[in-house]
UniProtKB/Swiss-Prot annotation:
Main location: cytoplasm
Function (record text): Catalyzes the attachment of glutamate to tRNA(Glu) in a two-step reaction: glutamate is first activated by ATP to form Glu-AMP and then transferred to the acceptor end of tRNA(Glu).
The entry's keywords: Aminoacyl-tRNA synthetase, ATP-binding, Cytoplasm, Ligase, Nucleotide-binding, Protein biosynthesis
Any one GO CC term of the record: cytosol
PANTHER family the record matches: GLUTAMATE--TRNA LIGASE, GLUTAMATE--TRNA LIGASE, MITOCHONDRIAL-RELATED
Protein name: Glutamate--tRNA ligase 2
Pfam families, A to Z: Anticodon_2, tRNA-synt_1c
Motif 'HIGH' region: positions: 12-22
Subcellular location: Cytoplasm
GO biological process: glutamyl-tRNA aminoacylation
Amino acid sequence: MNKTALKTRFAPSPSGLLHLGNIRTALFNALLARRSRGLFLLRIEDTDQERSSEEYVTALMEDLRWLALEWQEGPEVEGEAGPYRQSQRRSVYQADFQRLEAEKLAYPCFCSQEELERVRKRQLAAGQAPRYPGTCARLSPEEVEGKLAAGFKSALRFRVPSLTTIEFEDLVRGPQRFATGDIGDFIIRRTDGSPAFFFSNALDDALMGVTHVLRGEDHLTNTPRQILLLRALGLPIPRYGHIAMIVGRDGAPLSKRHGSRSVRELREAGYLPEALCNYLARLGHHYEDSGFLDLDTLAAQFDLARLGRAPARFDPQQLHHWQREALARCDLDTLERWLAPVAASQVPADKYQDFIETVRPNVVLPEDALHWAKVLFSEELVLKDGILPIIHEAGAQFFTQALAAVDGSGTDFKALAAQLKQTTGAKGRSLFLPLRAAFTGELDGPELARLLPLMGVARVRQRLQNCVDQSY
C-alpha cells in the first residue's frame, strides 16, 4: 500500500470489556479508513500488565469482528509495523528513552508520590493549575548518579521547552493552541520501567504510520504533550480529531444507570451488529440519509465535517429503533436461528416457524420472543396489571358466550368474534379487549387471528373458562 495512504487506528487497553464509547471510537476510525480506501489498524495497549488481561484481548477482538470492523494491521493479521502489542515493544521504547536522555530532552525524576501530592495541594490552594515544579530538572549529573547508586528508583520526565506555543488543527474542533508554560515536565517512563501513555501511544502512532487519530475529547489535552514528544524524536505527527463524549439524558457521563452496557452484554442480549453500527454511527455524527445503511454506505457517507462538538446523548429507545430496522431486514431463517437459543425449547417444533412469523412485529430482543412463547404455551397465564378489571367488567356471561362460540369456530378468531358480537352485542374495544385480556393477559400484542391457531382449541377454551371463573 502507498506509504502516504490514510491510516487510522483503534488502540484499546485490555483492562475490561469494550463499552459504547470505546466501540464508537473504533467505528468512526474504521469508517474513515474504509471511506478513504485506507487502512484500519488495531493496537493493544497492554503496558500495564497488572490491569491487562488476555481474556479481554480475546473479547475485544471478538467484539470488533462481530461488528464486522475488521482490521488490516494488528494482532492475528500482523503487518510491517508490528508487533502490535505494546508489551512486546519494550526494546523500541527503551531506545528512544535513552536517546531523549542523552540529548538532555529527558531526565530522571526521584520525586515520591507523597512529595508530588504535597506540591499539587499547595498549587491548588494558591489557585494555580497543578504542574510539576521541575525539582529534579535542576539536579546535577553527580546528584543523579548519587541517588541511583543509593538505590533510589527513578521515573523519566520529558523536559518541556519553555515559552513555546503548540498549535494544531483539530479535525473536529478546529484550531487549538496550548502554551507549554501550562503543561509542565511530564513522565514518559514509570519507575518500573514501563512507558507512560503519552509516550508509547504517540511513538507507536508515528512508527506504525498512523495518519489520522480520532479519539475521545478527554484526550485533547494530551495532544500538545504528544506533539512535543514526536517533534523531539523527529517523527511524523498524525492529524488528531477529538470526538464528543457520550452522555446520558441527564448530561452526565454515560454509565450503567443510563442503560449503557458493554458490547458483550449487548451482544448476549440479542442486539444485532447492524443495529448497533447504525445507532453508534449517528451518535455524534449527522447523516443526511436517515434510513438503515449497511457498513459500506455508512463509510461512504461518513464525513469529518459532520462530527458534532456537543456531547452525544445516549438514548436506548433509538437503539431499539435501529434494532427493529435491522430485524425487518432479516429473512425467516436468520430470525429462527437468532431466537432458537431462548425460544425453541418453549415452542412445539411443528409450530416454531408460524410462531416466529406471528410474533415478529412484537419482538425487539430474544427475551421478547421468550415472553410470547410463555404467553402462548404455558399452562398458567400471568396477567399484567390492569387486566383483571377488564375481565371483571366484561363479566362471566361474555366469556360463557365466547366458550359457546369456540364450539363452532374453533381457533378461527374472525368467526369467533363475529358470533360473539351477534350474541352479546359487544363491538369494537368492548369486544376485542376482553378477548385479548383472556387469551394473552396483555393489553396489546400480535394479531389474535394468528395467535389462536398456535394456542390450540384446548388452551383457548381453558383461558376462557378461567375468565368465567374469575368473573364471579
